Amino acid sequence: MPRYKAVIAYDGAEFFGFQLQTKNGVESVRTVQGELNKVINKMAKNPSPQIKVVGASRTDTGVHAFGQVVHFDLPFNIDPEGVRKGMNTLLPFDVVVNHVEHVSDDFHARFNTHSKRYIYRVSTTDYKDPFKRKYTGHFHWKLDINRIKAALPDLLGEHDFASFAASGNETATTIRLITRADVDEKPEEHEIVFTFEGNAFLYNQIRIMVGVLLEIGTGKRPVHDIVRLIEVKDREQARYTAPASGLYLDEIDYN
């Protein structure tokens, strides 16, 4: 069976995350993987056993994606562009397939990843903007962006990020490599945008890192408190977790 790799984008606001969730063998809530499975199986004339779409990243409820990657096998060979068009015809409006290509049978969307890039958008308006509430994390306290910029290099490199892992983390190790951590100001949009890139991230790691950086920006934490948090390996000391609404899976690299 030919294997396909697809790059998809989705508005995560109305999804309970990417990963399929079932109860008694039946899909219990709306998920991105669930929608993709339905479409692929419809295109394949509902084969038995059912085709399962495999995703690179299991984004949480409310998290968005510009560059999620999935793979799936079809029981017949179709031109990748035809697959893309067919999927987009059947998918709901909050999911779109931007690219499809043939890949080797041993390609795996999750296990072959080299690095992932995420962005986090923070709305800095004094009031909550109702039109941004599903697409940014709101933080109205005054921020010193220079303090945040001074703290970001402390995240770079390979560290034990146990202090930045939520209680649901199930990975064998909390050691991760971060290769990029920066922030851009968007004054015309009243936003700041964080970008993080690394080999992998722990459960809620980016949202917890953003929470710590925002507290550094307000002066609630010392500029280099990240160094201490890495050393103590204590999630309780990291405190604030930024909302899911501001997080976007931007790109996944397989090189």
From Swiss-Prot:
<feature type="binding site">
    <location>
        <position position="118"/>
    </location>
    <ligand>
        <name>substrate</name>
    </ligand>
</feature>
<dbReference type="InterPro" id="IPR020095">
    <property type="entry name" value="PsdUridine_synth_TruA_C"/>
</dbReference>
<dbReference type="InterPro" id="IPR001406">
    <property type="entry name" value="PsdUridine_synth_TruA"/>
</dbReference>
<comment type="function">
    <text>Formation of pseudouridine at positions 38, 39 and 40 in the anticodon stem and loop of transfer RNAs.</text>
</comment>
<keyword id="KW-0413">Isomerase</keyword>
<keyword id="KW-0819">tRNA processing</keyword>
<dbReference type="InterPro" id="IPR020103">
    <property type="entry name" value="PsdUridine_synth_cat_dom_sf"/>
</dbReference>
<dbReference type="Pfam" id="PF01416">
    <property type="entry name" value="PseudoU_synth_1"/>
</dbReference>
<protein>
    <recommendedName>
        <fullName>tRNA pseudouridine synthase A</fullName>
        <ecNumber>5.4.99.12</ecNumber>
    </recommendedName>
</protein>
<dbReference type="GO" id="GO:0003723">
    <property type="term" value="F:RNA binding"/>
</dbReference>
<comment type="subunit">
    <text>Homodimer.</text>
</comment>
<dbReference type="GO" id="GO:0031119">
    <property type="term" value="P:tRNA pseudouridine synthesis"/>
</dbReference>
<dbReference type="InterPro" id="IPR020097">
    <property type="entry name" value="PsdUridine_synth_TruA_a/b_dom"/>
</dbReference>
<dbReference type="InterPro" id="IPR020094">
    <property type="entry name" value="TruA/RsuA/RluB/E/F_N"/>
</dbReference>
<feature type="active site" description="Nucleophile">
    <location>
        <position position="60"/>
    </location>
</feature>
<dbReference type="GO" id="GO:0160147">
    <property type="term" value="F:tRNA pseudouridine(38-40) synthase activity"/>
</dbReference>
<comment type="similarity">
    <text>Belongs to the tRNA pseudouridine synthase TruA family.</text>
</comment>
